UniProtKB/Swiss-Prot annotation:
Region (Interaction with substrate tRNA): 37-40, 161-165
Lineage: Bacteria, Pseudomonadati, Pseudomonadota, Gammaproteobacteria, Pseudomonadales
Cofactor requirement: Mg(2+)
Catalytic EC class: transferase
EC number: 2.5.1.75
Gene: miaA
Residues with site note (Interaction with substrate tRNA): T103, R125
Binding site for substrate: T14, A15, A16, G17, K18, T19
Name of this protein: tRNA dimethylallyltransferase
């Protein structure tokens, strides 16, 4: 191992079993957990985010859970700052930071840093929001494809927040978001190569998922049904009762919450809500797999295996991450 302290990333698609394995690892390694999940940061959003129970969190604390109100935003840049601070505190106590979750953009921001994007411009943003209202998101997506085809290919046509931000960056700076990111990447080439990137840590990157994608889809459907049985609709109903929350907020646009919110707005039947919630979760898992396929030096684990703890320990020993 290099002179850098160790850190472990435990990544994977939703419903793959990341949290259970992470907790197992804390029982045999001197690790402390850091959540890497854009939904778990929000207080009061417990059922639909599959947040670990209060009992589990009391026994196995996770940093960066319940750190924001749903009315607040939380960016990848903010995550990077918070995660680096948490990792430094954990390392200073002689422990190993174990980062667990499936928000892949957060991992990438942590490793590579973030391109120095232009600040938000209220006037430009208002113009774009008015266009979205008058012309529809498809027109905004068409405009983005003209000036930044790579971002247009990456951003879903029905994702207003990211569409507007990408167009805002172009209109404010005269450069596409892709151009900004390429410059950032070029500047980072001198940094350490491999999974550690800019981080002052030697990183072991693990990913867990069922080898059979059909099994993952079954798990996703079962978990969404269980969420509904556990009171997910009432959870969203409580959020809707707040005058400061609306469907356009990042918190409410989280997978599952958006579909239940639309159901409570009368836009979907109960069956449609259930079906669309499951489909949206499957699409999230597909995007997570796409990120992971391009991740450097990742070691895969099969969710269906019964010995993932021993397999993980064997791998960590083989790469000397613990020495």
């Amino acid at each position: 191992m290099s002179g850098k302290p160790p850190a472990i990333f435990l990544m994977g698609p939703t419903a793959a079993g990341k949290t259970d394995l992470a907790i197992e690892l804390t029982t045999v390694l001197p690790c402390e957990l850091i959540s890497v999940d854009s939904a778990l940061v929000y207080r009061g959003m417990d059922i639909g985010s599959a947040k670990p129970s209060k009992e589990v969190l009391a026994a196995h604390p996770h940093r960066l859970i319940d750190i924001r109100d749903p009315a607040q935003s939380y960016s990848a840049a903010q995550f990077r700052t918070d995660a680096l601070e948490a990792m430094a505190e954990i390392t200073a106590r002689g422990k190993i930071p174990l980062l667990v979750g499936g928000t892949m953009l957060y991992y990438k921001a942590l490793i590579d840093g973030l391109a120095d994007m232009p600040a938000a411009d209220a006037t430009v943003r208002a113009e774009l929001e008015a266009q979205a209202e008058a012309l529809g998101l498809a027109e905004l997506h068409r405009q983005l494809a003209e000036v930044d085809p790579e971002s247009a290919a990456r951003i879903h046509p029905n994702d207003p927040q990211r569409l507007i931000r990408a167009l805002e960056v172009y209109r404010v700076s005269g450069e596409s978001m892709t151009a900004h990111r390429r410059r950032q990447f070029a500047e980072s080439r001198g940094a350490d190569a491999g999974a550690g990137g800019h981080l002052p840590y030697t990183v072991a990157s693990l990913a867990i998922a069922p080898t059979d994608r059909h099994i993952l889809h079954q798990r996703i459907a079962l978990r969404f049904s269980q969420m509904l049985e556990q009171g997910f609709v009432d959870e969203v109903r409580s959020l809707r009762a707040r005058s400061d929350l609306h469907a356009g907020l990042p918190s409410i646009r989280a997978v599952g919450y958006r579909q239940v919110w639309d159901y409570l707005d009368g836009k979907l039947t109960e069956n449609e809500m259930r079906e669309r919630g499951i489909i949206a979760t499957r699409q999230l898992a597909k995007r997570q797999f796409t990120w992971l396929r391009g991740w450097p030096d990742v070691h895969w684990l099969d969710s269906l295996a019964c010995d993932n703890l021993s397999r993980t320990l064997k791998y960590l020993g083989a790469i000397s991450i613990l020495s």
